[in-house]
């Protein structure tokens, strides 16, 4: 029974990682860049939801929508101001810029709201379902269900809509997409908007499970979600889901059966082993370069 309890907890944690990983996957798949400031967008989403629910006394759903709107706007602004001028720049320049944006958001949050922790309000039910000796909290069930709904909606959007087709075209060949009349810059901005909106959803779910908010809130979840995206295949949306769930389960099991202090090391060690065997990730495609 302890194993099942840890498995469910791992699925709940992994669902948060999966939602965050979808942001990494979409941005890399279309813009071919790694947005290492993505974790700090989660932090901004957490603060936005916190103030919407406590200072403005909004109900839960409007509060979440306010956080999503805030992060969506932030994602577009960051893309336009920081990343758009670097379209033709080297990967190193983009990486340095992403790290700079990350530090800017962290220090900006600390300047505005101080480093003192803030407690996210208990807006979701604290009850649990009982299956014999197994207890599953409603928050965990909501987290898992939200992840699945997000995954299905995003997959349908990418595969069944005209905008989704444009995104797939940009992912395959931006120059060809331009010749077909697709506004590539607009598609990239939309991708950042969607990824940042998902970061806000993940922020609320993360704070519902771990209610302490600080300016560094998004750092470790962001790193683990990036690990999940690489684990599953950085350009694969199903891979982001699979990677997130597996990383969550591995972390939960490592905490339960090995050591809480070593759990992160175990997660990254498993990632290295997988990449040695499958460099493209579990569901990633091997890329062949024509000479």
Annotate each predicted stretch with a short phrase.
Residues 8, 30-77, 81:
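Membrane-embedded helix boundary and interhelical linker motif in transport proteins
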Residues 24, 57-101, 108, 242-247, ...:
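Alpha-helical transmembrane segments within multi-pass membrane transporters and channels
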Residues 15, 24-46, 60, 88-93, ...:
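Short, non-helical or kinked segments that cap or interrupt transmembrane helices
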Residues 13, 131, 135-213, 237-243:
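Helix-loop-helix "hairpin" substructures at the membrane interface of multi-pass membrane proteins
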Residues 17-19, 57-69, 192-199, 203-269:
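Transmembrane alpha-helical segments in multi-pass inner-membrane proteins
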Residues 56, 85-160, 187-190, 211, ...:
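Transmembrane helix-bundle core of multi-pass membrane transporters
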Residues 1-20, 48, 58-63, 89-93, ...:
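Membrane-interfacial amphipathic/re-entrant helices at transmembrane-helix boundaries
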Residues 46-50, 68-74, 99-107, 146-155, ...:
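Hydrophobic core segments of alpha-helical transmembrane domains in multi-pass membrane transport
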